[in-house]
Amino acid sequence: MGASVKPAARRNARQFALQAIYSWQITKENVATIEEQFLSGDKYDEEELRASEPALAAPETDVAYFRELLSGVVLSHAELDSKIRPYVSRPMQDLDMMELALLRLAMYEMTRREDVPYKVVINEAIELAKVFAAEDSHKFVNGVLDKAAPHVRKK
């Protein structure tokens, strides 16, 4: 990560990317359309967003990173799924859609963004799970990524 990119801007990019990936999984809408909705503000009322999720409405977002994560996950979702599959104890189609989006996002970062330490990837996924997924999803996400990390990324 370059010195000019702040961690908060990356965190915001991940949050937007997670929600956009989740939206794509549900709708299968064109990535450019989903990206535009998130970046133009059409997806959310900004004041409402500030009240419910202040971090998402923060003025700092690494937009280039958001775009990379969204397009990268969508374009390589089948490959990412094949890397995730060995570490989940149930069929992929039985995963909660938010858990799947989280795992895809984290696996993309682990396999394609070696400039981001794997511990940061796992921690960010856990924090996102605590906010956006079911109550104990962060434990599941942590377990899967912890098992996968040594096999997909050199520590």
From Swiss-Prot:
One of its GO terms (molecular function) is RNA binding. Belongs to the NusB family. It comes from Vibrio parahaemolyticus serotype O3:K6 (strain RIMD 2210633). The gene is nusB. Keywords: RNA-binding, Transcription, Transcription antitermination, Transcription regulation. This is Transcription antitermination protein NusB. One of its GO terms (biological process) is transcription antitermination. Disulfide bonds: none annotated. GO terms for cellular component: cytosol. Gene3D superfamilies: NusB-like (1.10.940.10). It comes from the Bacteria. Involved in transcription antitermination. Required for transcription of ribosomal RNA (rRNA) genes. Binds specifically to the boxA antiterminator sequence of the ribosomal RNA (rrn) operons.
